[in-house]
């Protein structure tokens, strides 16, 4: 094979990969659009009357996750399953965002942390790497950390809306998250930076709870703070 033939062959490989990446980008753009729609829907809980609409907003968000499943099913067909991490960078951030949105819905519904397995059911993907398109553990953890930041904001807006017990529940939840993350030996630099922000979320919520206890707005809050 001549030098020119070698490079012609290589160009064929490069062109084929570029085609794959372009197809992936198209699906990811659709995923990002749907994620924005879900986020806009859920952001409404921060408004004055938003707390009354939580069940309705969560139900609507779950309907949007049906569209997410469709997009992810399409994404799976765009590349060989064994090359997941070769193209992972294309969908990593939107997948983390979708984990956060799924976790936010579950928290608003039950005030519990969604498991990685439950997220994969919501998104219609696999929990295990061996089964193909899956939810990477670090992507799951990143989404959970985004949730913590969102909940710290929610604690402040809860007070504005006159819901004085919610910040206490959020404080308990975020402190449990913090304790859980302390058990992990995080090697990923991006994930570690996100985790560094968790302590600020914890502090922000604790300040809200403390302020409520000082002002006597909530007996449950005051009693809990008195036990510390």
Swiss-Prot record:
Modified residues (Phosphoserine): 190
Cellular component aspect of the GO annotation: endoplasmic reticulum; endoribonuclease complex; male germ cell nucleus; nucleoplasm
Any one GO BP annotation for this protein: siRNA processing
Main location: cytoplasm
Entry's Gene Ontology molecular function annotations: endonuclease activity; identical protein binding; mRNA binding; sequence-specific DNA binding; single-stranded DNA binding
Annotated segments matching region DNA/RNA binding: 86-90
Region (Leucine-zipper): 177-198
Family matches, as Pfam families: Translin
Subunit details: Ring-shaped heterooctamer of six TSN and two TSNAX subunits, DNA/RNA binding occurs inside the ring.
Protein name (record): Translin
Classification lineage: Eukaryota, Metazoa, Chordata, Craniata, Vertebrata
Gene it is expressed from: TSN
